[in-house]
A protein has these predicted regions:
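Domain-scale detector for complete catalytic domains at protein termini or as standalone homologs
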Residues: 1-218
Length: 218
């Protein structure tokens, strides 16, 4: 199922990429690198187990592939996305951010923990080094961070990717795939297997998640 809740070009919304016939165990929310790359996650979702419902953030349509700064430095955009998540927070969440979308996913994850007390199961940061400002100070997140990188990608040296470790007090994993900058295409099935393994290794504690969501609405 592929549905869009966007009316105006400057709207922020969520696209439901896949919907399970029975209630899903997890929701994976994808943060693309631009407003024009959301459809990519349809092919990714087709490989995922039905226990994982996939949604993607639809950015304002004026954000293109050359507008990284609007994704990485926009507190307003992060706030708007956080507000749009409200109706989707009845299941344990994981975020998957690719390239500039990884920075934005981190910002929204930070806001989620701060405002609701409900941490993500996993924050997947793909094809992105940790911004230098993110490595200063104590860890902000408590959720697991899994960093993905392409072997030999000159734009994501592994030293910079490993710096994501400093952003969480929880577990950190680094996974490197062949394919350099385009590993997400050439290693798609391996990436999907990684997502499965990471999510299924964590038993969702619905009571704790729902308690955090209820506190937000109180």
């Amino acid at each position: 199922m592929y549905s869009l809740k966007q009316i105006k070009p400057d709207d922020v919304g969520l696209i439901r990429i896949s919907q399970t016939e029975t209630p899903s165990s997890f929701r994976l929310i994808c943060f693309p690198e631009s407003a024009h790359s959301t459809a990519y996650y349809l092919s990714l979702s087709e490989l995922l187990l039905p226990t994982v419902e996939v949604l993607a953030i639809q950015y304002p349509l004026y954000i293109g592939v050359e507008d990284e700064e609007r994704l990485t430095d926009s507190a307003d955009l992060a706030d708007r996305i956080f507000g749009a998540l409200g109706e989707w927070m009845d299941r344990p969440l994981a975020f998957f951010g690719h390239r500039a979308g990884a920075d934005l996913a981190y910002r929204v994850a930070e806001r989620l923990e701060r405002e609701t007390g409900a941490a993500l199961l996993t924050l997947f940061v793909s094809g992105r080094t940790a911004h230098w400002g993110m490595t200063l100070g104590p860890p902000v997140l408590g959720c697991r961070i899994v960093a993905l990188a392409g072997e030999g990608d000159p734009k994501t040296p592994l030293r910079g990717v490993r710096a994501w470790r400093r952003r969480t007090s929880g577990r950190f994993d680094l996974e490197v795939f062949p394919g350099a900058r385009y590993y997400l295409d050439s290693s798609r099935r391996e990436v999907v297997n990684l997502v499965h393994d990471q999510l299924l290794s964590q038993v969702p504690i619905d009571a704790e998640w729902e308690a955090g969501v209820e506190d937000q609405g109180a």
